[in-house]
Amino acid sequence: MTNIRKTHPLIKIINHSFIDLPAPSNISAWWNFGSLLGICLIIQILTGLFLAMHYTSDTMTAFSSVTHICRDVNYGWLIRYMHANGASMFFICLFLHVGRGLYYGSYTYFETWNIGVILLFAVMATAFMGYVLPWGQMSFWGATVITNLLSAIPYIGTTLVEWIWGGFSVDKATLTRFFAFHFILPFIITALVMVHLLFLHETGSNNPSGLISDSDKIPFHPYYTIKDILGILLLILVLMILVLFSPDLLGDPDNYTPANPLNTPPHIKPEWYFLFAYAILRSIPNKLGGVLALVLSILILMLFPILHMSKQRSMMFRPLSQCMFWILVADLFTLTWIGGQPVEYPFIIIGQLASILYFMIILLIMPAISLFENKLLKW
């Protein structure tokens, strides 16, 4: 009898994707983040579904409904904090996953890479809209500030913002539509993930050396299933430590105050995972310029396949590029720190320098270093 795993039309697809998939024999723990992101997405969809059963998307009752979830629903506090901190874990895994792609030259699979960048945008949009839902002070003012950025678009800006708001300010209509979008987007993300995997399995995985590994492949199961399970257990451990010991560590205290359009918080700032982009936005004194820099700070990832000048794919054997990569990482940490600081003397100039350095490293310095390393290869 033929194995059902290899003949059944549906199970066959799963088999080719997760069981009999030929994988390089030398992929390190940096390749675990894809599966971790999948687990994060599942956690977010499940916890989000249970939250949606008790949440009301109305300005009068949204804040109270979140309080009700935390106080009266069985393990509601656990579901709520798993969802909030699950988003942080999602972004940590995302940043590490993208960083791995940059370091090892995975962006040369450009369909997979571009779908990945679109996924990053979709997850960021979902997270932003989710942050608005509890209808605390930071939810309301964050929504006001970020949606207002669209008014910088010439000619149609103001009309566009009012159309998104569903009125002349962030109000009931805005909250309702944000809830609708926040609910539907994760399912769109799931579909995009399948496309992402489809393109990845056309080429097969990259590996740390950046060399073609066709001559040395091993089956995904049991080798990488076991490895992924270890990663998943560690992810859940870190998430549960965060949820059970310090659930509000990454949140903003202002969001425990119900939204009040008449009272602006002293420092409006987004969640930690948006701070680097927020710092780039604030570093340009012009509104339209800031918005363009904000969008380009993420969109620039799509340029990496074009900007790749090296004869080698991975940075494994390129110490100068490695050095520049870690300077870029340090620069992103600096931007994240600046994004959370008030707009005053030392922070403004540090933010501007870090923003200039960010774009310079990617657009000029790294391609130049790659060309120099090519020269070094000619003995």
Curated annotation (Swiss-Prot):
> What InterPro entries does UniProt report for this protein, alphabetically?
Cyt_b/b6_C, Cyt_b/b6_C_sf, Cyt_b/b6_N, Cytb/b6-like_sf, Cytochrome_b, Cytochrome_b_C_euk/bac, Cytochrome_b_N_euk/bac, Di-haem_cyt_TM
What Gene Ontology molecular function terms does this protein carry?
metal ion binding; ubiquinol-cytochrome-c reductase activity
Please tell me one Gene Ontology term that the record gives under cellular component.
Answer: mitochondrial inner membrane
Q: Where does this polypeptide localize? A: Mitochondrion inner membrane
Per UniProt, the keywords (alphabetical) are: Electron transport, Heme, Iron, Membrane, Metal-binding, Mitochondrion, Mitochondrion inner membrane, Respiratory chain, Transmembrane, Transmembrane helix, Transport, Ubiquinone
Keyword Heme among UniProt keywords: yes
Q: Which domain of life is it from?
A: Eukaryota
Q: How is the cofactor bound?
A: Binds 2 heme b groups non-covalently.
* Transmembrane domains' residue ranges: 33-53, 77-98, 113-133, 178-198, 226-246, 288-308, 320-340, 347-367
The residues listed in the UniProt record as binding heme b b566, with positions renumbered to this chain, are 97, 196
Q: How does it sit in the membrane?
A: Multi-pass membrane protein
Gene Ontology biological process: mitochondrial electron transport, ubiquinol to cytochrome c
The coenzyme or cofactor needed here is: heme b
**Binding-site residues, a ubiquinone:** 201
- Keyword Heme annotated: yes
The entry marks the following residues as binding heme b b562, namely 83, 182
How does the annotation summarize its subunit structure?
The cytochrome bc1 complex contains 11 subunits: 3 respiratory subunits (MT-CYB, CYC1 and UQCRFS1), 2 core proteins (UQCRC1 and UQCRC2) and 6 low-molecular weight proteins (UQCRH/QCR6, UQCRB/QCR7, UQCRQ/QCR8, UQCR10/QCR9, UQCR11/QCR10 and a cleavage product of UQCRFS1). This cytochrome bc1 complex then forms a dimer.
Q: What miscellaneous comment appears in this entry?
A: Heme 1 (or BL or b562) is low-potential and absorbs at about 562 nm, and heme 2 (or BH or b566) is high-potential and absorbs at about 566 nm.
Summarize the protein's role.
Answer: Component of the ubiquinol-cytochrome c reductase complex (complex III or cytochrome b-c1 complex) that is part of the mitochondrial respiratory chain. The b-c1 complex mediates electron transfer from ubiquinol to cytochrome c. Contributes to the generation of a proton gradient across the mitochondrial membrane that is then used for ATP synthesis.
Protein family: Belongs to the cytochrome b family.
Q: What is this protein called?
A: Cytochrome b
Source species of the chain: Neotamias ruficaudus
